[in-house]
Amino acid sequence: MIYWTVCGPHGIIEKGIILREEKVSLMRMKVSDYIAQKLVDEGITDAFMVTGGGAMHLDDGLGHQPGLHCYFNHHEQACAIAAEAYARIHNKIAALCVTTGPGGTNAITGVVGGWLDSIPMLILSGQVRYDTTARWSGVGIRAMGDQEFDITKSIACMTKYSEMVIDPMRIRFCLEKALYLAQTKRPGPTWLDIPLNVQGAFVETEDLIGFDPEDYEAGGTGWAGVYESDPPHATAEDFAGNGEQREPELPKVT
């Protein structure tokens, strides 16, 4: 006997009989695809990239996103300098995507230039799975995963905001925060380091919570516009302000 199956809109169908009902969500997306769509929704039209295994989901999402033009350079330093020059010429922010380890460290020179000259840039870097990072191990080793380097510690001094995104449900908040800070007040680079397991995770987009600029500018975390207290996806760093550089108050000239 030959059996055949087809996928219907509500489940798996065999010979016209529904065998299993499954929840259908038109808003379920892979995080990397959500990032790519979000960039376009926020007005970003160009991305400079060097592909790599540590950023495979990001590379796929950005590379296939309608409305996003991807330029594949031969070196990450060229990507960063191109993103900086793009902002100078077009007066708008571009995205930069690199892989883990040397992919991130190679981009640093161009990011330093963006920091010193107050140029808005959004850097997305791939990272090994979080459960293979030295940070996850908690034992003080320097590296555990293949081609791993905790880049956020190195670029904190040259970015307005940086974070390793380890919770897929934070991705909207982190993206909106990074884009807001990169382009407001004194502009500058912002950097999101995204492990492979987060890049490839699936989320219900309607459950994602965004960043609240008004709360942030009032000295809050950016969550309070949605939650009065104890946001479920907030981290201790949100409350401590780690990974970001708020605008200092300039001394008054008398």
Question: Where are the regions that the model predicts?
Answer:
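N-terminal alpha/beta PP-like core and its mobile active-site loop of ThDP/TPP-dependent enzymes
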Residues: 21-229
